[in-house]
Amino acid sequence: TATHLLHCALHQVVSPDAAQQGSFVSEDRLRFDFNSSAVSPDQLRLIEEKVNGWIEESLPVHCTERAYADVKGNAAIAQFFGDKYGDVVRVVQVGGCRDGLDGVSMEFCGGTHIANTKNIGLFKIKSEGAIASGVRRIEAMTGDAALEMIRQHVVAKSLEIAKAVEKIKEVNYELADMGLEQVLSLIH
C-alpha cells in the first residue's frame, strides 16, 4: 500500500508521466523504480510529506474486482499497458468509497494490502538515484524500520555535533594559551 501512495505522490510532485518500472515490497521496506529525470531534495521532502499525510488520514484501502472493459479507459486508475489483463481486474483503491472509484490512489494490483493507511505507521525515504538511463529508484522504509532509521540518523548527527564541540574547546584552549601577538599573526 505504501508503494501505491509513493506512486501517487510521484505523479503529483514530480510528473504525471512518472510511471512504475518495477518494485520490491516487504513488510517494512520497499524499492520503487520509475521513469523520470533526477528528483530534487525538495521534491523528495514533499513526497514524504504527502505519503505521511495520507497515512495520518487513516484512509481505508478497498480491493474490488471489476470488469476490465468497465475500467480500462479510466485515466484515474494506474494501469500498466505492457501488462496483459483478463476480463476481470482487481482495483486497489486508497481512500474514497468502496465502490466509488474516487480514492487518493487507484491501481490495478494483485498484491497484498493493509486495510487502512494508519497501519503503515511511518514512511521514510532512504535513498533515491539513477539505476539506468531515464530510470530512477527510491528505497524507503515503513513502520518501526523507518523509526529505527531516523533514530540512527539522530545518533550519528549527535556524535558529529559532540566531536565539533570538542574541537571548538580544543581551539579555545590553544588560543587562550597563545599571546595576543600570536593570535593576531594567525589572523593576518
Language-model regions: role of each:
Residues 5-13, 46-57, 141, 145, ...:
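Generic, well-ordered alpha-helical scaffold segments in large soluble proteins
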Residues 17-19, 27, 117-122, 126-187:
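Terminal appendage regions of diverse proteins
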